[in-house]
Amino acid sequence: MPRVVLNGVTVDFPFQPYPCQQEYMTKVLECLQKKVNGILESPTGTGKTLCLLCSTLAWQQHLRDAVSSLKIAERVQGELFASRTLSSWGSAAAASGDSIECYTDIPKIIYASRTHSQLTQVIRELRNTAYRPKVCVLGSREQLCIHPEVKKQESNHMQISLCRKKVASRSCHFYNNVEAKFLEQDLATPILDIEDLVKNGSKQKMCPYYLSRNMKQQADIIFMPYNYLLDAKSRKAHSIDLKGTVVIFDEAHNVEKICEESASFDLTPRDVASGLEIINQVLEEQARVTQQGELQQEFIVDTSSSGLNMELEDIAKLKMILLRLEEAIDAVQLPGDDRGVTKPGSYIFELFAEAQITFQTKGCILESLDQIIQHLAGRTGVFTNTAGLQKLMDIIQIVFSVDPPEGSPGSLVGLGISHSYKVHIHPETSHRRAAKRSDAWSTTASRKQGKVLSYWCFSPSQSMRELVCQGVRTLILTSGTLAPLSSFALEMQIPFPVCLENPHIIDKNQLWVGIVPRGPDGVQLSSAYDKRFSEECLSSLGKALSNIARVVPHGLLVFFPSYPVMEKSLEFWQVQGLARKVEALKPLFVEPRNKGSFSEVIDAYYQQVASPASNGATFLAVCRGKASEGLDFSDMNGRGVIVTGLPYPPRMDPRVVLKMQFLDEMRGRSGVGGQCLSGQEWYQQQASRAVNQAIGRVIRHRHDYGAIFLCDHRFAYADARAQLPSWVRPYLKVYDNFGHVIRDVAQFFRVAQKTMPLPVPQAVTSSVSEGEIALKDATLSSYSLSTRKAMSLDVHVPSLRQKPIGLPAAGDSESSLCGEYEQQTFSAQQRPMGLLAALEYNEQKAGASEEQALGSSTPSLRCEKRLSTEQKGGRKKVRLVNHPEEPMAGTQAGRAKMFMVAVKQALSQANFDTFTQALQHYKSSDDFEALVASLTCLFAEDPKKHTLLKGFYQFVRPHHKQQFEDICFQLTGQRCGYQPGKRELESKLTLSEGVDRQLDPGQHLNQGQPHLSAHPTSKGHTSHCTKVGCAVEKPGQPAVSDYLSDVHKALGSASCNQLTAALRAYKQDDDLDKVVAVVAALTTAKPEHLPLLQRFGMFVRRHHKPQFLQTCADLMGLPTTGKDLELEGPRDESPTVPPELTHEDLKPGPSMSKKPEKTQSKISSFFRQRPDESVRSDDTTPKPMQLPPRLPHELMKPHRSKQ
């Protein structure tokens, strides 16, 4: 590799660096050698990541060589080098004037970026260099943990708590193997990223999370996300020592926002209520254990400890603190216009002091909260959601992050913090509450609107100064969009002696930039608030897009100011037919809101652009979104970028308003207005930086070329043009006529395609791991499955999506219990005409059962098969071949392959590996119980994956099919199509028979035989009528969903939530009296609700059914003979349970080990244990729980907080 000497340091570079790259590396070395901070801006595509790595590692190697030479000189006591001066051993040591002792430990390099995907790209660049340092990548347990039990935890903090428990008790064998295998050569040598760590950890059976932490001690360069550095809690959790280190923030335009967000919080009524519910649950459990003396039996969870080591009085005090905090927030008077009130930052200490949360008590409170979270770690179910408690812990740590000096009051600290913080209290709106609802208590009826407590930091200097105070040697901030550098440095409030604003490395014929103020119809293009949704603007923008798509080759990127603007535009274009015109030119791909679907969509876009038969593709995204940050759209993937407007922050958002006020106050207080940003300047800068990030997608390397379209008339203003990158402004041109835009762009691309070298052919770029790239091999027609699904606009745009009839509303609590039941689709099959049609009809009929099971989970697969048939003229062609290379999509093997693709898309890589291992084990051992246990963990907990469990029916062997269908119905409420009384066919005479015989027998579970099918039945479920009421199940809908829907209609949302909560509790504790008490209280108030009590029998477990029958007879005044009263539900040997109840719950527990004695239960016994219920019987009154004498009685009442 070429070598270049810069500032006395020899740098190995993969190629001869360009002048701007040499200048960039010179500035980096200047920062390192002088031990000063630097802000370095270099346009995207100039190779700043490569320059950063090569220059810093070259300096580190140079320093290491210098120190080694000095140590050799000392060892020989100066005999060999007595005449040499210190400066001759290297400028790095001499220039700084440090003694030899300062370099005993070579400074570590900490390289931080926004996301792990960006860090993966950086590590990929590192592998292309000549340097081979010791590398460490830090990640979270969510990314690195491979322990099955820990991975199943729903939240990150629960994973942390359970992991710590297992590590402390030495019960995690993956952790135990780390120390033994850490020093093995194959792990210490290579450069590992996150995916490599997980692969090696799984292979070596050791924990990747703690492996990376051990590697950190010996690493030369450590990679981590921003928040690990900027958040004091994360620094402490990962034991990051910054003293003497070199810290590099890549993509540093996000640092300001991350600094402010890491020091801010929003406390909602839901968070307080969640914490109170958990504390109340623990309080009741501890009181019960204290009374019964059964502490050891009730609370041992995976450890040898005796349980929660807290007194009842301490738990009660903790509950009282949260109640007082809630009361203090509610006591704040708000104006009647829902705007909220703003107070200085020091007010947070006054508010918390009312709840007895102070500098003196914070330690005890944090310790108590941590004990409860650790105690509940590993439990499952909705009532162990400790997210609220974890958030309270984080809030207390943020507020009291700076301890006052000894002997001084905490009020002095509060006065100092008030300059950077504001407290904002505002009412919680119903739409926010519905949008964030994810747990049982969030839908509890509230008569009084709750209030949100916000504590916002408006100065990034708060976190940055704290970072520098840790002893950082050099801090380097770099990005492609930092200008203006002076204002950026002022916001950080730390010195940056070294600054650089680099030009680009491209020539004039590689970039075209045009401001397009009007569309083809002459209508002014604007994304201003009053015009963005007007039909004239939307229509003109759509016409402009369709015209630009005609002249821009290959990939075209379109960036909108926000998701609502993009979705509204797409909705309008769909109605007006404009989207269809663009689709005909370049298929549309839409950036999804959720992170999980993004990799699928972007990979499909890459594949579409790379297809030789296509004209490219159009990718619709949003500024500040995932596509605008760090993704590679080089060469054909991004020949054009359209920016449809200026993405200003929401002007009326309280946080934006307060930020602008804060900057104006700071500017007035400083007295030097020209040196500080005003609020309006910051507001404009936020929009321009987002635009500049989007623009940076088009030019990614020296020989790349592309066009930039700024489609908003406000880009023509002088202040907006001045905010554009310096390397873009020389190419800028304002067009008054849209026709001239098309003319010039067409000419630009004609010249560029003739003069610029052809891009080097590369593999299809992917944003996911290598294991997930295998999905692209499952192409079923001219486009892959992922491409088909990604091109479905209604999948990613909610406004275009039709809501299925009969599904519960998104906010209903029963939806979380039932899951999402997809409706069955029935299509009338036409009578086959002709021989070919008859053959195709027979094949489709033979595989109807498996295809139905698969099709309900992946609608895109049905579309795929239909489109494939349409492209072939609506009739399947039959070709006789001897050795087909891969199965056809219509065969059994083809459907199996489609199912595996769907499973791999739905599961993570680790879970998919578990799935394949379960398949292999079932094939070799025929162990059906082990198979069901594995499938239950993978598919039963998430309602969205229920149809995948149903689709697995095609792989089940004949003698297990009926048993599998019963289990599937119990877990999901869906049947697989098994027909009792009909023998499963052992072979099929279909067109795919020859194909199946050629397949590798290892792909089949039935000893190499074809997959067996079962024909679906359309008769539906048998209904059971009784004297009380009769319920007829609707075809294709589970009985559970019908019942909960009827409860919701009859009793209301609050009562339905109460019933589902009791049902979940019954699932866990098997306490029939408790659940019947709730159901009876809800359904016996009115005679017309009594059938709901009788129908509840579908949930009652088998050993409880006689007792439940007797109870129903007593409550409804019916005869007590079992012949006269029957329970509704399936008449099988297994109890009917809601879909969320897993297969493990069907196994006998401690309370189910033997059949209970038959007792005569009265309604009074049900209410005796429910002091919080208001329903009373004629012959009894509720009795409160017996408490220890010293415990306040009112604290044992269940808290009904505002939600």
From Swiss-Prot:
<feature type="compositionally biased region" description="Polar residues">
    <location>
        <begin position="1004"/>
        <end position="1020"/>
    </location>
</feature>
<keyword id="KW-0227">DNA damage</keyword>
<feature type="binding site">
    <location>
        <position position="172"/>
    </location>
    <ligand>
        <name>[4Fe-4S] cluster</name>
    </ligand>
</feature>
<feature type="compositionally biased region" description="Basic and acidic residues">
    <location>
        <begin position="1123"/>
        <end position="1134"/>
    </location>
</feature>
<feature type="binding site">
    <location>
        <position position="163"/>
    </location>
    <ligand>
        <name>[4Fe-4S] cluster</name>
    </ligand>
</feature>
<dbReference type="GO" id="GO:1904506">
    <property type="term" value="P:negative regulation of telomere maintenance in response to DNA damage"/>
</dbReference>
<feature type="region of interest" description="Disordered">
    <location>
        <begin position="998"/>
        <end position="1020"/>
    </location>
</feature>
<dbReference type="GO" id="GO:0032206">
    <property type="term" value="P:positive regulation of telomere maintenance"/>
</dbReference>
<dbReference type="Pfam" id="PF13307">
    <property type="entry name" value="Helicase_C_2"/>
</dbReference>
<keyword id="KW-0547">Nucleotide-binding</keyword>
<dbReference type="InterPro" id="IPR045028">
    <property type="entry name" value="DinG/Rad3-like"/>
</dbReference>
<dbReference type="GO" id="GO:1904355">
    <property type="term" value="P:positive regulation of telomere capping"/>
</dbReference>
<dbReference type="InterPro" id="IPR014013">
    <property type="entry name" value="Helic_SF1/SF2_ATP-bd_DinG/Rad3"/>
</dbReference>
<comment type="function">
    <text>A probable ATP-dependent DNA helicase implicated in telomere-length regulation, DNA repair and the maintenance of genomic stability. Acts as an anti-recombinase to counteract toxic recombination and limit crossover during meiosis. Regulates meiotic recombination and crossover homeostasis by physically dissociating strand invasion events and thereby promotes noncrossover repair by meiotic synthesis dependent strand annealing (SDSA) as well as disassembly of D loop recombination intermediates.</text>
</comment>
<dbReference type="GO" id="GO:0003677">
    <property type="term" value="F:DNA binding"/>
</dbReference>
<comment type="subunit">
    <text>Interacts with TERF1. Interacts (via PIP-box) with PCNA; the interaction is direct and essential for suppressing telomere fragility. Interacts with MMS19; the interaction mediates the association of RTEL1 with the cytosolic iron-sulfur protein assembly (CIA) complex.</text>
</comment>
<dbReference type="GO" id="GO:0003678">
    <property type="term" value="F:DNA helicase activity"/>
</dbReference>
<dbReference type="GO" id="GO:1902990">
    <property type="term" value="P:mitotic telomere maintenance via semi-conservative replication"/>
</dbReference>
<dbReference type="GO" id="GO:1904358">
    <property type="term" value="P:positive regulation of telomere maintenance via telomere lengthening"/>
</dbReference>
<dbReference type="InterPro" id="IPR027417">
    <property type="entry name" value="P-loop_NTPase"/>
</dbReference>
<keyword id="KW-0347">Helicase</keyword>
<dbReference type="GO" id="GO:1904430">
    <property type="term" value="P:negative regulation of t-circle formation"/>
</dbReference>
<dbReference type="GO" id="GO:0031965">
    <property type="term" value="C:nuclear membrane"/>
</dbReference>
<dbReference type="Pfam" id="PF23109">
    <property type="entry name" value="ARCH_RTEL1"/>
</dbReference>
<feature type="compositionally biased region" description="Basic and acidic residues">
    <location>
        <begin position="1169"/>
        <end position="1181"/>
    </location>
</feature>
<keyword id="KW-0411">Iron-sulfur</keyword>
<dbReference type="GO" id="GO:0006281">
    <property type="term" value="P:DNA repair"/>
</dbReference>
<dbReference type="GO" id="GO:0090657">
    <property type="term" value="P:telomeric loop disassembly"/>
</dbReference>
<feature type="binding site">
    <location>
        <position position="145"/>
    </location>
    <ligand>
        <name>[4Fe-4S] cluster</name>
    </ligand>
</feature>
<dbReference type="GO" id="GO:0000781">
    <property type="term" value="C:chromosome, telomeric region"/>
</dbReference>
<dbReference type="GO" id="GO:0000723">
    <property type="term" value="P:telomere maintenance"/>
</dbReference>
<comment type="similarity">
    <text>Belongs to the helicase family. RAD3/XPD subfamily.</text>
</comment>
<dbReference type="InterPro" id="IPR030845">
    <property type="entry name" value="RTEL1"/>
</dbReference>
<feature type="binding site">
    <location>
        <begin position="42"/>
        <end position="49"/>
    </location>
    <ligand>
        <name>ATP</name>
    </ligand>
</feature>
<dbReference type="GO" id="GO:0061820">
    <property type="term" value="P:telomeric D-loop disassembly"/>
</dbReference>
<dbReference type="InterPro" id="IPR006555">
    <property type="entry name" value="ATP-dep_Helicase_C"/>
</dbReference>
<dbReference type="Pfam" id="PF23116">
    <property type="entry name" value="HHD_RTEL1"/>
</dbReference>
<feature type="region of interest" description="Disordered">
    <location>
        <begin position="1120"/>
        <end position="1203"/>
    </location>
</feature>
<keyword id="KW-0413">Isomerase</keyword>
<dbReference type="GO" id="GO:0004386">
    <property type="term" value="F:helicase activity"/>
</dbReference>
<dbReference type="GO" id="GO:0031297">
    <property type="term" value="P:replication fork processing"/>
</dbReference>
<dbReference type="GO" id="GO:0046872">
    <property type="term" value="F:metal ion binding"/>
</dbReference>
